[in-house]
């Protein structure tokens, strides 16, 4: 396994892809690690037959620039990893069949802790506030801090963030449409 500089949450990857900055991101932080739970979250975009499948396509196109962190990589610490996740209420730690809220963040944090990776990248501000005091040796970095590093200047950073916000709105709208369709289907049956 290459020397991993940081562990990346799915939302950071999605944001980088939205503004076509994934290569800059991977180059800035090489080598990036993705917890297998985050990997499974990103792979779900493969089945999207819509304009957001590029998130998965970019992930595959750049697979030589990152490592997937598997629980088996933890060796003797795997039991502790699973125990920590169970204390947070996670019993299913695969996350390939459904979206388990915050599993990716916690799995990333515990991988960083057990593998002694000093940085975790996350957009979840509540998670960051809750966990940063608990594990002070791990620095949690937000998208805005990352974007500042990989942008040419403030105008470029603002442009990237504007694109990301627009794409997030589109994704949320699509999710609401899907949820509404599911609800209507269930009500009919």
Sequence positions of predicted segments:
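Active-site-proximal, substrate-binding regions of enzyme catalytic domains
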Residues: 2-115, 128-189
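Short, ordered loop/turn segments at secondary-structure junctions
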Residues: 125
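Short acidic/polar active-site loop segments enriched in Thr and Asp
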Residues: 118
């Amino acid at each position: 396994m290459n020397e991993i500089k940081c562990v990346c949450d799915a939302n950071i990857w999605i944001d980088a892809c939205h503004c076509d900055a994934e290569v800059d991101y991977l180059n800035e932080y090489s080598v990036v690690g993705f917890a297998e739970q985050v990997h499974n979250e990103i792979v779900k975009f493969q089945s999207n037959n819509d304009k957001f499948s590029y998130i998965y396509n970019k992930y595959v196109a750049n697979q030589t620039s990152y490592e997937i962190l598997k629980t088996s990589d933890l060796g003797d610490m795997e039991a502790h990893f699973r125990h920590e996740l169970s204390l947070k209420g996670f019993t299913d730690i695969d996350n390939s069949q459904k979206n388990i809220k915050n599993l990716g963040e916690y799995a990333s944090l515990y991988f960083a802790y057990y593998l002694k990776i000093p940085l975790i990248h996350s957009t979840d501000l509540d998670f960051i506030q809750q966990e940063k005091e608990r594990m002070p040796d791990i620095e949690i970095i937000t998208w805005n801090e990352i974007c500042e590093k990989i942008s040419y200047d403030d105008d470029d950073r603002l442009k990237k963030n504007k694109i990301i916000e627009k794409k997030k709105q589109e994704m949320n709208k699509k999710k609401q449409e899907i949820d509404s369709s599911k609800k209507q289907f269930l009500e009919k049956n």
